[in-house]
Amino acid sequence: MDTEQAEIVALKALTFLASDTELIDRFAAQSGVAPNDVIARAGDGEMLAGVMDFLLSDEAVLTDFCAAHDIDPEHPARARQNLPGGDLPHWT
């Protein structure tokens, strides 16, 4: 997966979060970014990375997202690796 494909997955995740008031509010509370600002920064790779971190931190939300968009459950983690800060080595 390349950066462009990763950004597409992350934008789908952002759309998924934005469509659910509870989820976007949880993301806003955790990130410290107002919901409107999250949407406005949709083109920001660091914001998209944060969206993916949030998605990957909750298995139920991740599963719902993958089902809603017919995405392989492994794709979000691969997408995250191709966004800013995702190239960190795994030590496990």
Where in this protein do the model-derived segments appear?
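Metal- and O2-centered redox machinery and metal/ROS homeostasis
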Residues: M1-T92
